Amino acid sequence: MKRRTIILSTASITAVFAFGWNLTARAAYESAPYKVLEKDGNIEVREYPDLLLAATGSRVASNGRDGSFMKLFRYISGDNENKQKIEMTTPVFMEDGVKSPDALMGFVMPKSVADSGAPAPKSSGVVLHNRKGGRFAVIRFSGRINSKMAAKQEAVLRAWLLKNGLQGEARADTAGYDPPFTPGPFRRNEVLIPLKEQVVVVDDVSGKTDAPSSNAESKDPSR
């Protein structure tokens, strides 16, 4: 019994240490900015600005093992026209990364690089891509993400949208925030669905609108 208690205590300490270390490591990277407009458990409605990505085609099921991750890593490591080294950021986006077998993997350019102009890629397989901002419904979850897991989370998120009277685009993206060596339980993954803009119809006589009102308050995002 004593030995079992010691083993359990050691496992608990290791888990707490790993969790704390992972949060510290994640906080070391600049992250894509957003504002939280509404929160319901692990689901949020966020407002994102336009973002500049260094991007390349990727097979979703490969989780970057098809060489797509390394293409982008080489770009930020100096394989560009200016031989400029660019800081790694979070998250790594996979646009249309749930349904489509072929997606676009993208590294977010740091704000200073985006503002001054990102260097042109040397590799023909890497492009600079403007990711359009706007409102997104987002669900957060842990584990080692794969196509099946992402599809399951997308279904949960779309059910929430239907329940709350919101309409999402057909596309669903994924986002990952952690290095490959991070244990599954401590990983931060997300599925993001762009929201359709609601059309507001104004009654010429009364001035009333048929758009639903929202009492959600904007707040700064938390990691």
Task: Spell out what each predicted region is.
Residues 2-223:
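A solvent-exposed interaction/effector surface
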